[in-house]
Amino acid sequence: MPAALLLAGYLAIACAGESALHQAVEKGERKLVEQLLTSGADITVRTESGETVLHYAAFPKDAWFATRLIAAGADPCALNNAGESPLFWSALEGNVAVARTLLRQRADANARDAKGNLALHAAAHNGEAAMVRLLLPQTKEPNARNREGLTPRDYAAASGHTAVVKLLEGAHQ
């Protein structure tokens, strides 16, 4: 029944402006995502805080969602109201598979959010070592300071992520 209602458009927009497509992607519902896209779901719809469905592809640990959404026309460089890209969200979630997909589609690892943070700041803060390893070669300024004057290494150190600190120390040279 939920799929039929979603496809019929009865639940097109839910709380916080999430579309049925946002919800299906977030929950990792491949079949429903495919049905919604095939039925003409709006790939450009945003939540009240500006997230596209591609931002939500950071949640399921499956790059299929990002690949499929980009093939349907989703913008890998789209920013939400806080200036965060889908790559930034993938870094926060530690979703390396999605981040790799986004980078292949020209997502910008050097884009900064409204606070001046790179995706590398987000990955370092959360101790996502695999993500840091992926982002380091893509980041022009791995020691970039955000508006508070903090580097990704500062975030990793403050959060007690020693393995990430060691990775980032090599970037100081």
Question: Model-found features: residue ranges?
Answer:
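Leucine-rich solenoid repeat scaffolds
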Residues: P142-Q173
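Bacterial N-terminal signal peptides
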Residues: P2-A12
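Conserved ankyrin/ankyrin-like repeat signature
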Residues: K31-L32, W64-F65, A97-V98, A130-M131, ...
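Ankyrin repeat A-helix N-terminal signature
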Residues: Q23-G28, Y56-D62, W89-N95, A122-E128, ...
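Ankyrin repeat domain, specifically the short helix-to-loop turn at the C-terminus of the second helix
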Residues: E34-D42, T67-D75, R100-D108, R133-E141, ...
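N-terminal segments that cap or nucleate solenoid repeat domains
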Residues: C15-T52, Y56
